[in-house]
Amino acid sequence: MLAAAPLLLASGNGFATTGPAAKPAVKPVTESRGEILSLSCAGCHGTDGNSSSVIPSIYGKSPEYIETALIDFKNGSRTSTVMGRHAKGYTGEEIHLIAEYFGNLSKKNH
């Protein structure tokens, strides 16, 4: 048994113990989940929802309006070329979070 002791200690399976492992530093999340999800919208609608092209602006629209539009795109009751495909990729909860984020931007900027 004594001959095996150095092997056990070297492998970490011996009697020697150390303190608890240090926890890695965690960077706090500063963005909301809705803000993170909205990043895929920014390419067409702008980072703040205020489009500078022929794509409709969603800045200033209510969360309810945006959520209803996304749900309608998702279920096909509102026709589109691209939005239906995007909306189908989101859960109902994610659609709600995106709508809340964009719908409340104009309130934050005043």
UniProtKB/Swiss-Prot annotation:
The keyword Transport applies. It comes from the Bacteria. GO terms for cellular component: periplasmic space. InterPro entries: Cyt_c-like_dom, Cyt_c-like_dom_sf, Cytochrome_c_Oxidase_Subunit. Keywords: Electron transport, Heme, Iron, Metal-binding, Periplasm, Signal, Transport. Heme c binds at C41, C44, H45, M83. Dimer of one cytochrome and one flavoprotein. Monoheme cytochrome that function as the electron transport subunit of sulfide dehydrogenase. This is Cytochrome subunit of sulfide dehydrogenase. It comes from Chlorobaculum tepidum (strain ATCC 49652 / DSM 12025 / NBRC 103806 / TLS).
